């Protein structure tokens, strides 16, 4: 394992002004976000979407700013939806200037500034509804979470436009928080119930180089879970009142593992609690560990990543296997139909993976990042950009959903909007900032993590390395990297070899490269000149995937994967009772291009078996000695799982019986 010093080499963030995505697949998603999703979400935030849950988020800011009368409406964290929308707009403006959109964003920023209190405090719920209760319920009420998202928006808007208006607002907010929290006698010795402020403060430190912001992030992380417990202290001080009663009074205070506050981080051995909170927290910890060269926190990241990725990660890149607390369960407990796998959790997982890659050049993090992106993140949004999943099941039986309340969180189709609408704007900001995930630029090498078509310019010392990636992943196997620099540049390209590809082939200017990979990356060092070409052939045959024997939910079953994509069966192609379909171990696969909503996408077929019975409703519920079903041949059609539920309500499943 590399030492801390070796892994802490300088990492530069890609300037998204210098990167243009032209990928035939994911590029369409960026266009969809820019042209459809951002305007749609702006309408939703202003309550202009028919048959959708009201948001009132913009109205809350107007009320807090004194520009409108009324009462606060929505979740206690409603402000964060506006912040994430602003961040998505910022990254979108890097791709394509839009004067009208920028003007709208500027107006929102002025509204946010008008809602800020003189001392820097910014939160519409407490400003409008409970000004006397500021900073009295950190465990439950998301003040620092909302602050974190607004800080992220301020950083993004500054990086995207050079405008400092929102950056000044969030610096004033961060300065206020720094005055309230810390080790001083007159300060609160607390930390957020929902982590977010930690990763946001690290991003703010990146652009301001203000050491107080890094120190405050460190304080929040180090103080977490210590005794005497802050959540208990503040609970007593406010008269034992609680905001949430989902699982009984004060359940968030009592169940400290829910917020990863049951122990100091250094003592935690398992990924536990609310999945989004976990990955947001660890994103901040990983960023802090690298920049502060803190070996202890680095080891915390490695230990908890390993538990999550090796024992609690779904094949789809989803995390959080139970609806109770939107949380992790125990090792290897990965049910397919009652799973939660929140869209935000997979976005947070990508953020955590990105910071781990910056800390350690190991492709395992990029493999997970890619798995989350191409499956759960893309699956969280319909192909029209106007409907969204909060929860991402691996198996759905729509007929049971209205009657069995264990499935109350599961929806058979994507929704227009949510009362708790954290996921839609989160998906938008992730897709507009994809350029941050493609590369990890280090002083000694440019690491290419994702083979998404783009053109980029990367500073290398006093020179600039320009290159283009072209291809059509995840559908076709060939990726071409072309050097596009006017002057020769001596540098190293580190090419990720995906875990799903058993036999990658690489050529440089037509000559085969046979170098051994190190931790999943192939290193090519040379004097790069304009026109130099590296070609990767990443064969993507259809592969069967089997679960660890300890995952009881997939015993005797198999999943189908091609490239980074997980595939599933849908009722629209295969009829009802998908549980009665079997894929023989000897079956071969054929691929073909889809039509309609599946145009330009690769589908898969195989000859399978349906175990059916005549008029099963007329038969006994249980049979002695002989199964009532007869085996009949049936062609099985598999679609990319991220595309499911784009053709109406129907059954779906990833894991198929293997005969």
Where are these regions (language model features)?
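A conserved hydrophobic secondary-structure block that centers on an alpha-helix together
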Residues: 129-207
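Solvent-exposed beta-strand/loop surfaces of large extracellular or lumenal domains
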Residues: 501-525, 544-550
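Carbohydrate-binding/catalytic loop surfaces
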Residues: 55-75, 123-142, 192-204, 234-274, ...
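Hydrophobic core segments within long, regular secondary-structure runs in both alpha-
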Residues: 23, 30, 42, 86, ...
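Low-complexity, Ser/Thr/Pro/Gly-enriched N-terminal "stalk/linker" regions
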Residues: 2-81, 106-126
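C-terminal beta-rich recognition modules with glycine/proline-rich loops and embedded aromatic residues
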Residues: 217, 301, 363, 367-375, ...
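Catalytic-core region of carbohydrate-active enzymes that cleave or remodel glycosidic bonds
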Residues: 284-311, 334-386, 397
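Well-ordered alpha-helical scaffold segments within catalytic/enzyme domains
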Residues: 26, 86-99, 148-163, 197-209, ...
